[in-house]
Amino acid sequence: MEIKIDTETLLKGISRVQGILEKRSQMPILSTVLLTAKENELEISATDLEIGFQDSYPVETIEQGSITISGKNLLDITRETNSRKIYISEKENNWIYISDNNAQYNLSCLPADEFPVLTEPKDIVMIEIESKIVTEMINKTIYSITMEEAGFKLSGVFMEKINKDGENFLRMVATDGHRLSLIDKKIPDIQKIDMKQGVMIPKKGLSELNKLAMENGNILFGLKQNNLVARKGKALIVIRLLDAKFPDYKNVIPTKKEDKENIITINRRPLLEAMRRMMIIRSDQYQGVKVNIGVDYLEMVSINPNLGNVDEKIEIKYDGELIEMGFNPRYFIDALQSMDSDIIYLNINDQTSPCLITGDQDVGFLGLIMPMRV
């Protein structure tokens, strides 16, 4: 293999796969990228055996072929050069020569035929989804995935098809046992995708899918053989689904009381900023904030005996009974940051019930935060 490629093009391609590469794997090949030179095209592939990604970039091909190279080393070389083009050539006995008109690198590599092959399931049914919808659904659920290794059943986003009033929707749900985030979106042709009773997408796979969605253009999306497959242009990502049963989350969501005295109307930004200030004196031992809700006010009190306390009151629209509860401010921050509404609604049935969060500009979204003892 022998190529010349624009530095910016190579940097874009190599940067794109860094999140997939395994840094401490017992399989060294998983820390490499596969470079495949075709006629005027360079394919860059990466995998950790759970996620596979491939995209193509324009290149001046001198000789076609394939090589592997450390993804980190190639990224560092590309970042540090001040040359507009980089020359890469395969040498004998698994060596690679790289030149940028200033420095010359001779690097060892692994045989290209040892790189795990990225295979797209055959005869897969795919539908087109707007990228902005994919991004919104991921951003409004991914933060609720558990960070605990023991919580395997919760370590991804659950995706299923639902029917509301005769129309088909795609639903994503995530929970860590202390909070839940859910979003429904109407997707044309979603009925063509076979999800059985729903599927679990791992957090790392969602992050990579989100990167693909944030680029221009719509996404082709499909499921087959325990894999999620997505395409955009020449980019392909294959994500292995989690083999886990998601908990019965529907029983956790209380029925919202629609009477106005139980609904708290509040500006999202002041609440978000106040919750951030509550975090200033937070510690692992003192994580909660006391929330007092009265007629037209919401008061937050955070106390840490080792540091001090912080107290703040903000205006709201509320005409119900006094409510005193405790919450983890981090959970409010994550939910509020993901939302777009200027005005949001908090629905609390009683002092032992979860807090439901919705907003008019966040169509189909529901946030749920469990109370805690403070």
Where do the protein language model's features map onto the residues?
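Structural preference for solvent-exposed beta-strand-turn elements
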Residues: 1-374
